[in-house]
Amino acid sequence: MSRVAKNPVTVPAGVEVKFGTEALVIKGKNGELSFPLHSDVAIEFNDGKLTFVANNSSKQANAMSGTARALVSNMVKGVSEGFEKKLQLMGVGYRAQAQGKILNLSLGFSHPIVYEMPEGVSVQTPSQTEIVLTGSDKQVVGQVASEIRAFRAPEPYKGKGVRYVGEVVVMKEAKKK
């Protein structure tokens, strides 16, 4: 049995778990997420706890039970608390502005970048150099943050670009004459 799958997932109050024929549906105050059921993993719901057991003793079944537990745990946290990623713009003239589901970025190009948020992700800009992404699906929030960062990744000489808050950019030394 997977070491990750040994720990049950505690379902907090206000989160509803439903078993469908092909998917596990988790509903909470931040929305609804579904997880497709895998044939190698059995999921049981008792006393507010989800337990994951491999159906057979194969390596793949053990691995899938741990993977399923981790993904469902993230979904439970997402629909109850939500996930947040913060980005920071470093550089002269680099600005961000949120207008509903659209993020306008000025990153030193000859044109502004207009990024439309996917379903389930909201964006706020507390200041012109800060971006805060929130949503219930951890994977989608991380993917959006990664795509925004990829527009202008931090460069190693001056550190200009879009970075995660708390990210350490390793700086290089300039060429000496």
UniProtKB/Swiss-Prot annotation:
Q: Which Gene3D superfamilies match?
A: Ribosomal protein L6, alpha-beta domain (3.90.930.12)
Report the InterPro entries cross-referenced here.
Answer: Ribosomal_uL6-like, Ribosomal_uL6-like_a/b-dom_sf, Ribosomal_uL6_a/b-dom, Ribosomal_uL6_bac-type, Ribosomal_uL6_CS
Q: Per the UniProt record, which residue ranges are transmembrane?
A: none
GO CC aspect terms? cytosolic large ribosomal subunit
GO biological process terms, alphabetically, are:
cytoplasmic translation
**Keywords (A to Z) from UniProt:** Ribonucleoprotein, Ribosomal protein, RNA-binding, rRNA-binding
Gene Ontology MF terms: rRNA binding; structural constituent of ribosome
SUPFAM superfamilies assigned:
Ribosomal protein L6
Described by its record, this protein's role is as follows:
This protein binds to the 23S rRNA, and is important in its secondary structure. It is located near the subunit interface in the base of the L7/L12 stalk, and near the tRNA binding site of the peptidyltransferase center.
Q: What's the subunit arrangement here? A: Part of the 50S ribosomal subunit.
Q: Which family does it belong to?
A: Belongs to the universal ribosomal protein uL6 family.
According to UniProt, the name of this protein is Large ribosomal subunit protein uL6
Q: Which organism is it from?
A: Neisseria gonorrhoeae (strain ATCC 700825 / FA 1090)
| Encoding gene per record | rplF
